[in-house]
Amino acid sequence: MTFSSFEIFKKKSGTLIPISLNKDIPFKSKRIFLIYGNREFVRGNHAHKKCSQFFLPIHGKMELSVIDKKNNKKVKLDSKKGKGVLLKPLTWCKLSFKTKNSVIMVFCDREYEFNDYIENYEDFINIIKKKKK
């Protein structure tokens, strides 16, 4: 898990947070998607075998519950902070929205592949236990 910060330019007319795809996103993006949700909506609850994902909050606050072979923590994201987080493959992630009308953008280093998903938590734990050895 790696965090990235973005420069924030605030004026009375609004806030600008520029993002350079080739510089600020830590890989060449092959897929981008948006997730919309309201308070206490939960998404995710899975891991990827090969896909890395970069999560960037667009509007509102959200929390990622992240489990990998080194971490088991909750990561708070806020669109006003100009920060995103990179999750590598074999990272279990549960996304919880904490404010109304929250939006998060997710950049992926791979196209969608059905077989890349690990949706059973016990299977995931067994896989990362084997990787620790």
What are these regions (language model features)?
Residues 94-95:
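Cyclic-nucleotide recognition modules
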